[in-house]
C-alpha cells in the first residue's frame, strides 16, 4: 500500500522539486523557465524513481542542461551552514515522508542573514533555525546538498568570443569579492586616519615645548601615539589576512571555472589553435594574485592616506587647499594624460612573452628536429627574432611608464619645496603656527613619498590589466551548448547517414546494431570530418546524420558521447592505467577494465609492470609503447559500452597480430555495435560489412 501511495504521489513530489529548482536559480533571470522545465522533464524521465532518492540527480542534470554549474555534495550540517555563510546557495531535502520530498533553498548571498525558500515562501532566518531545519531529517549525520556559486556568471560566461576591455575583466573577476574588498577599503581608511597620529602628535609636542617645559604632556602624547600606532598595526594585520583570503578565492574560482570550461569547449571553433599553448595563460593567475594583493594593501592605502592628508591640509589654510587642488590635477595628469597607451603597450609586451613561451614549447615538443645542427640554428634564430620583438614592445611600454615616473619624481621635489616656502611665509605672516607647519610637512612627506612609489604601482596596474587580458583568452573559449535531450525516445541504437557528401559523392546508409562501415581513403580528410560530425565535434555541411531518428545536435553533448565513442589520436593524461581507461566513470568497475584489456591481450603486458593497473603514465604514455597505447584507447572506448563506435585511422598503424586481436574484439557478436571506421588499409576495410571507397573515381561504386 505504501508503494502505491508513493507512485501516486510522484507527480506531486516532482512538482515540489521543480518549484525548488526554479527558486534555486531565481537570481539568474537569463535562464529560460521553459528550457528549465523541459530539462527537468527529461531528467525525471531518464532517472525515473523515488523523488526522495533522486531529487539531487534531477536537480544537477537539469541545471547542467541550462548551463548552470552545480555540485552535489555530502556534508555535515556545520559544513552546509559554513557554505551558506560564504555566500553559496544550497538546495537540500532535510525532511521527507511517504508523500514525497520537501526541498528547501538556503540562500547565503546576504552578509547579514541567511534566507530560506520553501514551498514558494521566502523568509530570513537565524543560523540556529537553519541548523534545526537541516537536522530535522537526519540528526547530526551527513546531508546531501546541491550547491551553486551565485557569482559564477561574473567570469564571462562564453558561448562565443566576447569583446571585453581589460578594465571590465578586472571588475568581473573581482566583483564576487566586492564585500571583502570594501572591508579592505574600510581598513585602509582607518589606517589612513591613524597615520595622522604622528603629525598631530608632533604638532602638539612642538606647541607644548614652545610654551613650556613640562614632562607630563610629553608622556601623555607618547602613550596616546603608542596606542594609535598599535591599533593601526592590528588593523593592517587584519587587512593583510582579508587580502590573503581574496587571493585564495581568486585562484580557486578561476581554476574551477577553467576545469568546467575546458572539457566543454567547442572543438569546431578550435581548429587551427594550439590549445595547450593557450592554456599556459592560466599561469597569469599568479601575477594577478600578486598584483591584486599589492594594490589592495599598498595602492588603496596610498590613495586614502593621500586623500585624508589633503583634507587635513585644506583645514589648515585656504592656500593649502589650493595646494591640494594643484596636487590632484598633477596626479590626474600623470595617470590619464601621460599614461596614454600604457595598457595597450603592456598587453602587447605580454603577448610577446607568450610568443617566446610558445616557441620554447615547440622546441621541447620536437626533440628530434631540433637536435640537429640546422635545427639548433633555427631554434636560436627564431628565439632571437622573438627576443627582439619583446625588447621592442618592452621599450615602448617602458617609455610610457618612465615619463610617468619622471613627472611623479619632479612633482615630489616641487611639492615639498613649494610647501616649505608657502608654509614658512604663512608662519611668518602669523596665519599658521609652527606646529601646523611641521605637521603639514610630515603629511606632505607621506603624500609625496607615495609619488615615489607611484611608478611601482602604475607598473603593477598595467601588469594586472595585461594578465587579466590573457586570462580573458581562456574565458572567451567558446563552449558547447549545454541543452539537449538526455535520452532519446527510441532504443534501436541505429545510425542513419542520409545524402552525406563524402569523396565527391552523395551517399546514404542505415546501420543497425552489429553492422559496420569502412570509409577507405588515402589522403583525404572527409571521413574524419564525418566521424567528428557524428560525435558532435564538427558540423556537416551537406546531408543528414540521424541517431535513433535524431540529429546529434538534439542531444546534450555529454549524453551523446555516452552513446557514441570516438577513437582518434592517442590521448593520455598523467594518471594510472586504470584511470586512463575508466575516466572515473562510476558505472565502470575495475573488473570491467581488466576484462576489456584481457580481450585485447593487453592485460599481461600491464601486469608485468611493477604497479600493474596502478602504474602511472605520463602525458607521453611512458612506460607503454605506441601500439599498446593505441589498444588502450580502444579499451577506453569499448569499456563504456557505447552503442556507436567511431574509429578514425586508429587501426592503421597496428601490426598484424595486434590488428587481428583488435578486430576480433570489435566484431565479437556479443557487442552488437554500430561501427564506423576510417582507414587507408584495404585489409581492414575487407573485414567490415560495408565499404565506402574514396580511392575510386567519382561516379564509381
At which residue positions do the language-model features occur?
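Transmembrane helices of ABC transporter permease
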Residues: 223-231, 236, 297-348, 421-432
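Membrane-integrated ABC transporters
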Residues: 1-197, 215, 239, 243, ...
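Transmembrane helix-loop-helix hairpins at lipid-water interfaces of multipass membrane proteins
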Residues: 105, 111-112, 182-238, 242, ...
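An intracellular "coupling" helix at the cytosolic face of ABC transporter transmembrane type-1 domains
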Residues: 267-268, 280-292, 296, 300, ...
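ABC ATPase nucleotide-binding domain helical subdomain, centered on the C-loop/LSGGQ "ABC signature"
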Residues: 578-619, 664
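Primarily ABC-family ATPase nucleotide-binding module
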Residues: 475-518, 668-673
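Hydrophobic alpha-helical segments in the permease module
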Residues: 224-236, 327-332, 404-415, 434-456
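Cytosolic ends of transmembrane helices, especially the final helix of ABC transmembrane type-1 domains
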Residues: 352, 375, 447-477
Amino acid at each position: 500500500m505504501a508503494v502505491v501511495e508513493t507512485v501516486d504521489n510522484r507527480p506531486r513530489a516532482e512538482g515540489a522539486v521543480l518549484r525548488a529548482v526554479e527558486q534555486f536559480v531565481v537570481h539568474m533571470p537569463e535562464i529560460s523557465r521553459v528550457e528549465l522545465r523541459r530539462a527537468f522533464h527529461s531528467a525525471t524521465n531518464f532517472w525515473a524513481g523515488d523523488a526522495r532518492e533522486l531529487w539531487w540527480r534531477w536537480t544537477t542534470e537539469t541545471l547542467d542542461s541550462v548551463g548552470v554549474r552545480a555540485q552535489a555534495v555530502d556534508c555535515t550540517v556545520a559544513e552546509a551552514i559554513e557554505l551558506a555563510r560564504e555566500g553559496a546557495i544550497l538546495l537540500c531535502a532535510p525532511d521527507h515522508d511517504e508523500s514525497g520530498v520537501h526541498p528547501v533553498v538556503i540562500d547565503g548571498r546576504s552578509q547579514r542573514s541567511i534566507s530560506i525558500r520553501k514551498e514558494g515562501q521566502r523568509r530570513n532566518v537565524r543560523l540556529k533555525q537553519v541548523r534545526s531545519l537541516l537536522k530535522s531529517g537526519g540528526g547530526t549525520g551527513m546531508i546531501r546538498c546541491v550547491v551553486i556559486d551565485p557569482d559564477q556568471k561574473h567570469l564571462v560566461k562564453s558561448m562565443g568570443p566576447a569583446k571585453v576591455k581589460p578594465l571590465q575583466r578586472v571588475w568581473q573577476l573581482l566583483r564576487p569579492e566586492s564585500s571583502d574588498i570594501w572591508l579592505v577599503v574600510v581598513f585602509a581608511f582607518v589606517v589612513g586616519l591613524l597615520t595622522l597620529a604622528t603629525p598631530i602628535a608632533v604638532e602638539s609636542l612642538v606647541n607644548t615645548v614652545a610654551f613650556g617645559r613640562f614632562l607630563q604632556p610629553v608622556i601623555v602624547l607618547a602613550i596616546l601615539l603608542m596606542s594609535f600606532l598599535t591599533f593601526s598595526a592590528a588593523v593592517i594585520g587584519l587587512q593583510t589576512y582579508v587580502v590573503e583570503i581574496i587571493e585564495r578565492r581568486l585562484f580557486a574560482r578561476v581554476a574551477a571555472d577553467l576545469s568546467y570550461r575546458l572539457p566543454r569547449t567547442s572543438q569546431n571553433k578550435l581548429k587551427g589553435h594550439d590549445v595547450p599553448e593557450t592554456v599556459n595563460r592560466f599561469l597569469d593567475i599568479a601575477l594577478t594574485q600578486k598584483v591584486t594583493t599589492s594594490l589592495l594593501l599598498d595602492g588603496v592605502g596610498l590613495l586614502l592616506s593621500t586623500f585624508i592628508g589633503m583634507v587635513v591640509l585644506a583645514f589648515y589654510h585656504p592656500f593649502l587647499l589650493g595646494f591640494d587642488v594643484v596636487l590632484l590635477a598633477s596626479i590626474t595628469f600623470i595617470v590619464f594624460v601621460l599614461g596614454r597607451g600604457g595598457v595597450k603597450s603592456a598587453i602587447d609586451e605580454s603577448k610577446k612573452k607568450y610568443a617566446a613561451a610558445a616557441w620554447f614549447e615547440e622546441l621541447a615538443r620536437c626533440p628530434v628536429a631540433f637536435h640537429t645542427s640546422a635545427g639548433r640554428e633555427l631554434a636560436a634564430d627564431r628565439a632571437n627574432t622573438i627576443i627582439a620583438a619583446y625588447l621592442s614592445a618592452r621599450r615602448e611600454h617602458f617609455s610610457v611608464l618612465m615619463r610617468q615616473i619622471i613627472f611623479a619624481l619632479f612633482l615630489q621635489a616641487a611639492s615639498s619645496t613649494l610647501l616649505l616656502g608657502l608654509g614658512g611665509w604663512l608662519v611668518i605672516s602669523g596665519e599658521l603656527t609652527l606646529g601646523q607647519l611641521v605637521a603639514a610637512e610630515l603629511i606632505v612627506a607621506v603624500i609625496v613619498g607615495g609619488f615615489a612609489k607611484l611608478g611601482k604601482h602604475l607598473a603593477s596596474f598595467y601588469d594586472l590589466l595585461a594578465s587579466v587580458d590573457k586570462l580573458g583568452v581562456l574565458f572567451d573559449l567558446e563552449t558547447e551548448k549545454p541543452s539537449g535531450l538526455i535520452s532519446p525516445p527510441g532504443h534501436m541504437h541505429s545510425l542513419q547517414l542520409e545524402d552525406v557528401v563524402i569523396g565527391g559523392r552523395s551517399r546514404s546508409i542505415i546501420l543497425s546494431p552489429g553492422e559496420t562501415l569502412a570509409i577507405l581513403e588515402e589522403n583525404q580528410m572527409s571521413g574524419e570530418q564525418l566521424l567528428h560530425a557524428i560525435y558532435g565535434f564538427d558540423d556537416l555541411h551537406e546531408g543528414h546524420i540521424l541517431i535513433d531518428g535524431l540529429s546529434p545536435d538534439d542531444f546534450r553533448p555529454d549524453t551523446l558521447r555516452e552513446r557514441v565513442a570516438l577513437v582518434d589520436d592517442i590521448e593520455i593524461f598523467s594518471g594510472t592505467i586504470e584511470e586512463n581507461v575508466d575516466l572515473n566513470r562510476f558505472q565502470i568497475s575495475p573488473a570491467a577494465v581488466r576484462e576489456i584489456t584481457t580481450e585485447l591481450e593487453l592485460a599481461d603486458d600491464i601486469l608485468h609492470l611493477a604497479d600493474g593497473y596502478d602504474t602511472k603514465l605520463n602525458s607521453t604514455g611512458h612506460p607503454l609503447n605506441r601500439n599498446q597505447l593505441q589498444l588502450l584507447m580502444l579499451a577506453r572506448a569499448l569499456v563504456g559500452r557505447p552503442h556507436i563506435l567511431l574509429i578514425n585511422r586508429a587501426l592503421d598503424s597496428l601490426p598484424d597480430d595486434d590488428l587481428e586481436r583488435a578486430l576480433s574484439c570489435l566484431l565479437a557478436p556479443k557487442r552488437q555495435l554500430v561501427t564506423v571506421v576510417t582507414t587507408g588499409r584495404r585489409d581492414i576495410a575487407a573485414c567490415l560489412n560495408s565499404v565506402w571507397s574514396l580511392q575510386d573515381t567519382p561516379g564509381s561504386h
